[in-house]
Amino acid sequence: VQVGASSAIYGGARFALTAIGHHKHVVMMNSEADLIFGPYLLAQAQKTGVVYTSADGDQHTVIKRLINDIELWGFTTVMAGNMKGYLDQRSNPTAIIPEADKRFMDYKMCASYTDGTKLNIEMALVANGIGACTDVPGMHGPQVGDIYDLFQHFDFSKLWNGETPIVDYVLNAYPPGGVFVVGYNDHP
């Protein structure tokens, strides 16, 4: 098994394709490469008879695991989302230098966590993986006090068509950090 843990998008995809070409299973930890090249890499892995998968543990894979659980219990997925603690869409690699230095992080990577880039990549992976969509470009991302407050911010009777799941995120929800899935079941 080969693990792709590079932060280089093209290099990560090339690594995975080379591993697949050598009949190695691939666990991809590079969500950016997975978003852009994942469907192609999966098709190549299937042709070769090996496994290509995302690593469990990042938001998009934890969301998918929750979806698998609620669907096993007989629920239909209505919304899948991320609980983001902080978002500054004006952040950039230069402005984030002091914060990145405190955390010993790469400036571009830290900016991507702060400006919503990473959030959008993860939610695009979820949407592509489950056939979901956003309600509006960029998602809503309301501020909520508690995760259960999301029912006050999303009118699911208007947003959800009964079939296609929605992806979105909430800001500053309690408990901090994490992911959520809203399911529906009409059985008592």
Predicted regions and their residues:
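Generic structural signal for well-ordered, non-membrane alpha-helical segments
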Residues: 9, 34, 38, 59, ...
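Short secondary-structure transition/capping segments
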Residues: 15, 39-42, 65-67, 90-92, ...
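Hydrophobic beta-strand scaffold residues
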Residues: 26, 51-52, 77, 134
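Rossmann-fold NAD(P)-binding glycine/threonine-rich loop
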Residues: 6-22, 29-51, 55-57
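Redox-cofactor binding/interface segments in oxidoreductases and associated redox assembly factors
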Residues: 2-4
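C-terminal catalytic/substrate-binding lobe primarily of soluble NAD(P)-dependent oxidoreductases
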Residues: 99-188
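Rossmann-like NAD(P)H-binding beta-loop-alpha module
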Residues: 45-47, 53-118
